[in-house]
């Protein structure tokens, strides 16, 4: 759809229903779900799905983009409600929870990883920027180190998310996240 033309209210509702139905199917781990099933679940015709998304891959990309949008909007709200180091802690745990929920989604995303889609690079950049914003706020408040970038922290989180294949990984991921946060805290050396 052209970005310059806003959607009518009914078209917006249909698009949102399609994204919601696709997200749920993908999160349920149904990587092979057919667009017909998604359209039926959304209460629209298959033609409506294809008017909004030219291909199944375009639908997958948009679901993922919306997930990233939701994640990357969280830091501003967290900083409004908490001190920067606590906001960072909560955001790190939110990312771990997202990885847990996104386990089924990762199977679906594999289908677009081989394409030249910029969706993953954009997502990485946006998440690194969100982490960088939290780190900068913590550094300005004197509670977090200033020598770690959002990109570096995102790479560390990537390692944590690779634990998903193991039993009880979430508890271990939360412990490692705590260690990361402890390492990021700005510590004033004791006076001699």
Residue ranges and their predicted role:
Residues 107-117:
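Short linear capping/connector segments at secondary-structure termini
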Residues 62, 73-101, 116-119:
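Hydrophobic alpha-helical connector segments
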Residues 163-168, 174-190:
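Conserved NTP phosphate-binding and transfer environment spanning the P-loop NTPase/kinase superfamily
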Residues 53, 60-67:
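Alpha-helical DNA-contacting segments of helix-turn-helix folds
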Residues 1-41, 58-61:
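Basic, helix-initiating cap at the start of DNA-binding domains
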Residues 43-53:
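Short hydrophobic/aromatic patch on the recognition helix
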Residues 69, 115-161, 165-167, 171:
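Amphipathic alpha-helical packing segments from all-alpha helical-bundle domains
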Residues 20, 69, 85-100, 129, ...:
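Amphipathic alpha-helical segments that line or abut small-molecule/effector binding pockets
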